[in-house]
């Protein structure tokens, strides 16, 4: 929960700053907790769109863990929205990708409950 996301909008070359929330069900494979942070950081380093970043994090973890049971929610401020054009300083964008067991509405609800606190 609350993994720092610091990326760059590929359209406007302005910062995207937020938090990623990641969860998985292990099928026997585990990774060090900091590896989740490193995966988020790895994909955040390049100019991005948030939707793709969210999917890339899930796919990388699915491959590393050998399970489809991975979820990622990213809540981030896009300085291209906050500082230019509409200049809405209070808005953020939320994207989500759910794989495997997280597609079940009860499992998804439980995960979203954990990250909303």
Predicted regions and their residues:
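A domain-level signal for the structural core that forms small-molecule/cofactor-binding pockets
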Residues: 1-117
